[in-house]
Amino acid sequence: RMNIIINQLQKNFGPKVAVDIENYSIQSGDMLGLVGNNGAGKTTLFRLMLDLLKADGGSVHIGNIDVSRSEEWKNITGAFIDEGFLIDYLTPEEYFYFVGKMYGLTKEEVDKRVARFERFMNGEVIGQKKLIRNYSAGNKQKIGIISAMLHQPQVLVLDEPFNFLAVSYTHLTLPTIC
């Protein structure tokens, strides 16, 4: 079971408390959505969960792995926080192959897995012969979500997955990530 356990997690930026979570657990199979104002600490929490930011105190465990003390959790976790995760001088195909290679996938396996997202991409991502930097924000969002799911992770962390997506795609996003 791939539970996420948060214990005594704290992060401050100067006098501002960004995250202060005593104890929280997300059970395997659960889906959690965070809602809050801008600056409430949602993205900070995700960055702490992914060890992209050092906590002032406490810990995050994915499975039995403390994310700040081991890299093992990375093989079972997929994430897309923002377009900073993308390598924008690659085409989507090159980027998917790059991500796939990190997880030991062949080009054929990547192609097969990307094909499952065909409806979600709506003919706007693959085969366009352009760099990621030249895509719309919505299509960059799709590329990020697909890349996070490419290796079929047990844990998926997406920050604002509906951001930049046209309303007509939001109904496709949830089934894509579930």
Regions flagged by a language model, labelled:
Residues 170-176:
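Conserved small/polar residues in nucleotide/adenosyl-binding loops
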Residues 2-28, 56:
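A short, flexible loop at the N-terminus of ABC-type nucleotide-binding domains that lies
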Residues 35-37:
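The feature captures the beta-strand-to-loop junction immediately N-terminal to the Walker
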Residues 58-73:
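Conserved ABC transporter NBD signature motif
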Residues 150-154:
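A short, proline-enriched helix->beta-strand linker immediately N-terminal to the Walker B motif
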Residues 97, 101, 109-127:
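Conserved ABC ATPase "signature" region
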Residues 50:
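Helix-to-loop junction immediately C-terminal to a conserved catalytic motif
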